[in-house]
């Protein structure tokens, strides 16, 4: 028995306008009504489901290339992090390179 449906967002669940069209919304609604957990997966940081046309659907999400997993209420369930000491060493070793950092609270950049 299938219990979960996970799919990438951009170019898969979302169209060129970065929205889920009616066909996708109906399919996701049917999956959730059948009892499946539908999990959008994305490289984006924490995902605001509503802005992509999924308003009213209880969807969990796998964000930041899998490093943040949150439930349908936005509660962070699990994070996988890089040791802060390693991050500090990288910033010192490569001062001219821009680093991006995703956290459950948002995105941060070194430059």
Predicted segment positions?
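Detector for methionine-enriched segments
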Residues: 1-4, 107
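Active-site phosphate-binding/coordination module
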Residues: 18-111
